[in-house]
C-alpha cells in the first residue's frame, strides 16, 4: 500500500488558506501555488541519496556531502500542474520536465491521454507527478499508467489538496506510488469538486473560466 504524507508545516498551511480563499486574485494565487510547491519539494526530496566528497575551504581540507547524481524529472498534468513546476525547479534546477495531457471521454467519462512528452531516459529517472488537485484520481491514475508503460519505475505524486476518493484510487491502482499532499479534504461533492477545496485550479492559475 502506498504511503500518504500530509505536510502540516505552518508556512504551507498559512499559504494554503489564501490559496483556498475565493477573493485571492490570479497573480497572488499563482505566486502562492509556486511558493507551496517549493516548500513541498523541500520535504519530498528529503530521501534523495548523497555521497561524501572532499573539498578545500579557505581554511582547510574538509569532507562534505553532495547529491549523488540521481536523475529526477517533474511531470505536470496539463494544464494546472504547470503552476507547480517552477516552484520545484527552484530547489532542483537540473531536473528535466515532461508533460502529460489528458481529457475526459464524454461517453465513458474516463481520462484519455492526448499528449505526452517525456525525457528520453525514462527508465533511469525518478519522477514526481504534480497537479494541484487530486479529486476522483482518474487523471492521476492514468498519468502514472502513462509513465509506467514507458518504463518509469520510481514515481511520486504531489498535489496541494486531495479528496479521500482520489487517494483511494491511486492506492488501489498503484500501490507502489507514494502520495504527498498539503491537505486532505473532506469529500467530493455531486459535481466532482473537492470540498472545501479551492475551486478550479486551472482557471484560478490562468485567469480563465
Curated annotation (Swiss-Prot):
The keyword GTP-binding applies. Its cofactor is Mg(2+). It catalyses: UMP + diphosphate = 5-phospho-alpha-D-ribose 1-diphosphate + uracil. Keywords: Allosteric enzyme, Glycosyltransferase, GTP-binding, Magnesium, Nucleotide-binding, Transferase. Uracil binds at residues 194, 199-201. It is an enzyme of class 2 (transferase). Its EC number is 2.4.2.9. Catalyzes the conversion of uracil and 5-phospho-alpha-D-ribose 1-diphosphate (PRPP) to UMP and diphosphate. Pathway: Pyrimidine metabolism; UMP biosynthesis via salvage pathway; UMP from uracil: step 1/1. It holds the Pfam family UPRTase. This is Uracil phosphoribosyltransferase. Binds 1 Mg(2+) ion per subunit. The magnesium is bound as Mg-PRPP. Allosterically activated by GTP. InterPro entries: PRibTrfase_dom (IPR000836), PRTase-like (IPR029057), Upp_B (IPR034332), UPRTase/APRTase (IPR050054), Ura_phspho_trans (IPR005765). One of its GO terms (biological process) is uracil salvage. 5-phospho-alpha-D-ribose 1-diphosphate binds at residues 79, 104, 131-139, 200. One of its GO terms (molecular function) is magnesium ion binding. Belongs to the UPRTase family.
